[in-house]
């Protein structure tokens, strides 16, 4: 065994350097933890351009877990094992966490039989590819959005591979026409590929061979008592089951180690790696013992437990491999004078906050070397480039080390930990110069896409027709009209009456948004009376809202100016890099504060996504304003816990900036509160953070310039009235993950500015959410699982009276774990004491009511059980779940219910939404679902729903938008709007063999209903061709009819009918088209005439194949206009949602 000595920061450089010199040799670079392994891999990709450098990830689950690892990890591991198996021509460098060397994996030759290489022009069919994917653990869905999923649409197959990377394979008969990458969010293709290699989506491939192995090995290990075992039944049926990866050896006759996948590899390792191997062995033995103890209890699990020797190799077996003579053991040095292999040394002379004059002296001293400065983020890179230019040096931006040049400063986004130098290079990290932080690489879905996701419609939902009232959407149904099939929306009304709406007119119906609705009677006048009644009320609401907004805008405010250098210093103290959305929100606030009007903005961002930091930037700008005398900022929060947390954070962040910060809540004594109020009135306090205690008639401010309202949904009516009085002359910033429907609705009508923070922080994982009947086995497993990974758990009980029962259950289920209780009837000081102990890790489980909904931020607490979750509201559930998974560790939420049969449809719907809204950044979606469930609410009164129930949320929203636009004197289509009806005798529908999923098809129909001009129609058409292939004639007919309908709307044509001998046109009753009609009839007197009922008849022999051309020519002749000059106005007669968000 060779021993080498050099700085720890140069480990990846050393490994890639050795690999580059020995390209036929396999290497394994091991790390002491998973984060280091990933960092080493990223560094290796910079140091070398060799394609045979691989990273083998660890499971994100613990040994003997009953949940499956992340799909991306499963798929990535299988992909790497496939590459290691099939790439025999050259050497390989494998980077992995040392504990992975203990894993027992499928036999080495297994993956050589289960991969597929595709290329354009290759002979292959969609059926063959679909069969391969199913047999290799991929899941077939209507749309592919997650790793390991695929979708088949006619002659197109979409597939998501690790990364995630999405590919679209287009077939033509029995060969592959093209392979393209596509964007998962937009589903639009981006670039072509010459080759695609598809590996299994899991290390376990469910086929006849592996299922047979599983069945035999299962019986041999656990006997025949497997009846009614859902895991066993699922697997032998060829279906995946949560956590079945813990039984991997049962699927194969033999297993291999990771080392077996390489050819006599050289290990590069250190003492920490060896220690990690020993610790992991100790860990999985502990988990095995714990699992065995669980199985002895009466709560029998259907998860059998394999012994450690079945699942893992021993630490002694692996360490024996490490100590063989050709391997390289690394010891680290800290001294520049050490004797070093390859002349690598630490650059310890570069200290943090080195003045840049000293830096460039160092660069001059190493002028014979290539200088490389690595930044961790784009903002850091821009700062380094700017500084380099200021010192009159040339820079060369690089992505790989082999792009580095001499005599210039090479800069790039490079994941270096610390500075070091070699004989040829000097590597300097920007983090040591700028105190730079790693940034999140997650991309933000555009606001338009976030809003689009909300616009869904499901079978069985209540809908509202503008003319006929409330009905229930039953399904899409194809009807035969004049021998041609046409898709219709089938709507049920009272008395079992049915209304059929052609899909091209889908915009005439709106979502009602509430489960409990009474169906209207077709032809009844009661609907029109309800609508007219609400119209008058909406006028009052709209006028009041306009007056509020106008009053705020008339109250001009001096532009907020602050010291930029001091502000930059404040920003530099933020320990993370801002996400793209945070920067956007901060810039929005800057603009608001500088435009001379009072700000009124809502920040909607998921829990833990950085809203507080955005608020702190706003606080700094106002509190340090140069053109105000003693400006004050008030931060209002709903709970004492959140108040204490904010106070601590503000004190830490604003240290050294000369601002007096105080808190006011129930933990503050009456005497101290009186002093604080006095100092507020005199201007001695710059920033006050308070609960409802601050919203008191005795609270007076010297010069309140900014009011920040955190989690507004928790404040009562009286408190909101007091807040209103503060708002009238102050800048206002509201923050919430799930804002109350009223606040969100005001943002969506354009009366309150909206910023969305949808980009998760770096390495954030979504919380896995399970809705289930109470199961003591699963709950015990969940709580012990969290305990054994070194964490703590929340157990939320909605009602105080149920806490005693939960105590009894915990004593029985997990007697080995400790717990304490917190609820609203305890004194604030007692709650504070319990919370402090939980923060410190003095007990395992916090049993509490929903008082933890806001303000708890404990990185080690990542499991939550919610008792009787159906009793809680949607926003409450979302806020509670947001207490866990706030760091790099995955959170698990278990929403227990007594029985699905006992739940109302409303409760069941809430739980379905929270379970399905697992994606990071779902708060905006949750809030909008909340509006659907509760209604938008009366915007200016205390009533939550009122008369809105009579017309439904979407139509109410549209009527309000329209009335606001009228008062604001904005151009809008008249309320007496008509929807053109087009009957051309063509087949109009989306065929099942093109798109089979009815929900997806319905969503596309709704999008079609929102298309407002020819350009949008053509873009939509291009997207459909890209996603699903060439348009069938029936779908093409639909889009042609939409374009004709838009032109009819421009020409005030209410009905256009065709027959064998021509067209009949009926104009809208109030349309003034007399001159155009008379001119048209005069010009085409042989073909055109006006009937006694004022309909225009145009005689022309028609055939199907040219009817679209004929009707377009007719309309162009009639109107003398082109379609592309139609205003960008939807037929709904109101701005679309997406256009209302600024």
Swiss-Prot record:
Binding positions for ATP per the UniProt entry: 605-612
Catalytic activity, EC: 3.6.4.-
TM spans (from-to): none
Helicase ATP-binding domain boundaries: 592-757
Entry keyword set: ATP-binding, Cytoplasm, DNA damage, DNA repair, DNA-binding, Helicase, Hydrolase, Nucleotide-binding
Domain Helicase C-terminal: 778-932
Enzyme type, top EC level: hydrolase
Motif (DEEQ box): 710-713
GO cellular component terms listed in the entry, alphabetical order: cytoplasm
Record CDD domains: DEXHc_TRCF, SF2_C_TRCF
GO MF terms, alphabetically ordered: ATP binding; damaged DNA binding; DNA helicase activity; hydrolase activity
HAMAP family listed in its UniProt record: TRCF
Similarity comment text for this entry: In the N-terminal section; belongs to the UvrB family.
Protein name per UniProt: Transcription-repair-coupling factor
Native organism: Rickettsia felis (strain ATCC VR-1525 / URRWXCal2)
Lineage of source species: Bacteria, Pseudomonadati, Pseudomonadota, Alphaproteobacteria, Rickettsiales
Gene: mfd
């Amino acid at each position: 065994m060779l021993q080498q000595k050099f700085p720890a920061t140069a480990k990846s450089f050393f490994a890639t350097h050795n690999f580059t010199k020995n390209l036929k040799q396999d290497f394994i670079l091991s790390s002491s933890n998973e984060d280091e392994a990933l960092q080493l891999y990223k560094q290796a990709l910079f140091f070398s351009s060799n394609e045979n450098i691989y990273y083998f990830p660890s499971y994100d689950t613990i040994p003997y877990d009953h949940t499956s690892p992340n799909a991306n990890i499963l798929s990535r591991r299988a992909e790497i094992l496939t590459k290691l198996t099939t790439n025999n021509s050259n050497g390989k460098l494998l980077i992995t966490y040392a504990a992975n060397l203990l894993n027992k994996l499928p036999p080495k030759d297994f993956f050589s039989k289960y991969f597929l290489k595709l290329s354009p022009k290759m002979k292959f069919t969609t059926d063959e590819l679909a069969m391969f994917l199913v047999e290799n653990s991929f899941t077939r869905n209507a749309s592919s959005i997650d790793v390991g999923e695929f979708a088949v649409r006619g002659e197109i197959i979409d597939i998501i591979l690790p990364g995630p990377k999405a590919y679209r394979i287009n077939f033509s008969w029995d060969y592959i026409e093209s392979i393209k990458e596509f964007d998962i969010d937009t589903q639009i293709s981006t670039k072509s590929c010459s080759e695609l290699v598809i590996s299994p989506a899991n290390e376990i491939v469910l086929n006849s061979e592996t299922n047979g192995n599983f069945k035999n090995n299962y019986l041999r290990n656990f006997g025949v008592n497997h009846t009614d075992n859902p895991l066993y039944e699922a697997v032998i049926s060829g279906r995946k089951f949560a956590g079945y990866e813990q039984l991997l050896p049962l699927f194969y006759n033999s297993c291999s180690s990771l080392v077996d996948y390489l050819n006599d590899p050289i290990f590069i390792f250190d003492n920490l790696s060896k220690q990690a191997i020993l610790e992991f062995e100790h860990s999985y033995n502990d988990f095995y013992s714990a699992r065995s103890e669980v199985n002895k209890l009466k709560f029998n699990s259907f998860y059998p437990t394999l012994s450690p020797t079945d699942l893992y190799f021993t630490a002694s077996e692996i360490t024996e491999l490490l100590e063989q003579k050709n391997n390289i053991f690394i010891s680290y040095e800290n001294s520049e004078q050490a004797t070093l292999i390859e002349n690598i040394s630490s650059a310890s002379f570069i200290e943090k906050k080195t003045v840049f004059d000293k830096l460039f002296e160092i660069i001059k001293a190493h002028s014979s070397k290539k200088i490389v400065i690595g930044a961790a983020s784009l903002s850091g890179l821009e700062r380094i480039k700017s500084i380099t230019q200021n010192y009159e040096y040339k820079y060369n931006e690089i992505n790989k080390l082999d792009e580095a040049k001499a005599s210039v400063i090479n800069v790039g986004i490079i994941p270096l930990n610390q500075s070091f130098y070699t004989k040829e290079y000097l590597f300097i990290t920007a983090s040591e110069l700028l105190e730079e932080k790693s940034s999140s690489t997650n991309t933000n879905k555009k606001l338009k896409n976030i809003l689009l996701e909300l616009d869904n419609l499901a079978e069985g939902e209540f809908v509202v027709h503008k003319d006929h009232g409330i009905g229930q959407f039953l399904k899409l149904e194809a009807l035969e009209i004049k021998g041609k099939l046409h898709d219709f929306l089938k709507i049920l009304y009272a008395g079992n009456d049915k209304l059929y709406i052609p899909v091209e007119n889908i915009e005439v119906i709106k979502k009602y948004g509430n489960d409990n609705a009474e169906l209207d009677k077709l032809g009844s006048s009661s609907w029109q009376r309800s609508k007219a009644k609400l119209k008058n009320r909406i006028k009052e609401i709209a006028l009041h809202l306009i007056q509020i907004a106008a009053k705020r805008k008339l109250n001009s405010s001096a532009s907020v100016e602050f010291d930029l250098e001091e502000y930059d210093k404040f920003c530099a103290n933020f320990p993370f890099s801002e996400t793209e959305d945070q920067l956007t929100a901060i810039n929005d606030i800057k603009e608001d504060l500088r435009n001379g009007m009072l700000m009124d903005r809502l920040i909607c961002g998921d829990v833990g996504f950085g809203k507080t930091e955005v608020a702190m930037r706003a606080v700094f700008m106002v509190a340090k304003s140069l053109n105000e005398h003693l400006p004050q900022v008030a931060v209002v929060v709903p709970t004492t816990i959140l108040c204490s947390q904010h106070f601590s954070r503000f004190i830490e962040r604003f240290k050294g900036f000369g601002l007096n910060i105080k808190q006011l809540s129930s933990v503050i004594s009456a005497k101290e509160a009186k002093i604080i109020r006095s100092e507020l009135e005199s201007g001695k306090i710059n920033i006050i953070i308070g609960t409802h205690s601050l919203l008191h008639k005795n609270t007076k401010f010297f010069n309140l310039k900014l009011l920040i309202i955190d989690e507004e949904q928790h404040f009562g009516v009286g408190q909101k009235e007091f807040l209103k009085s503060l708002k009238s002359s102050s800048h206002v910033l509201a923050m919430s993950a799930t804002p109350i429907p009223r606040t969100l609705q005001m943002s969506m009508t354009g009366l309150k500015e909206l910023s969305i923070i949808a980009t998760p922080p770096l390495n954030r994982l979504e919380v896995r959410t399970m809705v289930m009947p109470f199961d003591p086995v699963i709950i015990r497993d969940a709580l012990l699982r969290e305990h054994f990974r070194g964490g703590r758990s929340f157990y939320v009980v909605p009602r105080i009276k149920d806490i005693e029962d939960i105590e009894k259950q915990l004593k029985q289920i997990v007697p080995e774990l400790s717990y304490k209780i917190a609820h609203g009837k305890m004194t604030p000081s007692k709650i504070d004491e319990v919370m402090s102990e939980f923060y410190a890790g003095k007990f395992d489980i916090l049993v509490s009511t929903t008082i933890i909904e806001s303000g708890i931020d404990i990185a080690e607490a990542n499991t939550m059980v919610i008792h009787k979750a159906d009793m809680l509201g949607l926003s409450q559930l979302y806020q509670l779940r947001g207490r866990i998974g706030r760091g790099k560790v995955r959170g698990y939420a278990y929403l227990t219910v007594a029985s699905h049969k006992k739940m109302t449809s409303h409760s069941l719907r809430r739980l379905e939404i929270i379970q399905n809204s697992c994606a990071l950044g779902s708060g905006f979606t949750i809030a909008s679902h909340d509006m659907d469930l509760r209604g938008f609410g009366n915007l200016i009164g205390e009533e939550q729903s009122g008369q809105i129930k009579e017309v439904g949320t979407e139509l109410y929203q549209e009527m309000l938008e329209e009335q606001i636009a009228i008062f604001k004197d904005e151009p809008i289509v008249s309320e007496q709007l008509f929807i053109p009806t087009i009957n051309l005798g063509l087949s109009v529908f989306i065929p099942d063999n093109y798109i089979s999923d009815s929900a997806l098809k319905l969503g596309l129909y709704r999008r079609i209903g929102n298309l407002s001009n020819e350009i949008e129609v053509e873009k939509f058409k291009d997207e459909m061709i890209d996603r699903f292939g060439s348009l069938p004639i029936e779908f093409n007919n639909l889009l042609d009819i939409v374009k004709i309908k838009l032109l009819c709307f421009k020409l005030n044509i209410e009905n256009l009918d065709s027959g064998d001998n021509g067209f009949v046109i009926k104009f809208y009753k109030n349309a003034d088209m007399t001159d155009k009609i008379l001119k048209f009839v005069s010009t085409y007197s042989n073909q055109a005439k006006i009937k006694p009922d004022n309909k225009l008849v145009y005689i022309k022999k028609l055939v199907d194949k040219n009817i679209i051309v004929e009707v377009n020519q007719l309309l162009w002749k009639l109107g003398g206009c082109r379609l592309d000059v139609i205003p960008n106005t939807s037929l709904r007669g109101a701005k679309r949602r997406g256009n209302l968000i600024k």
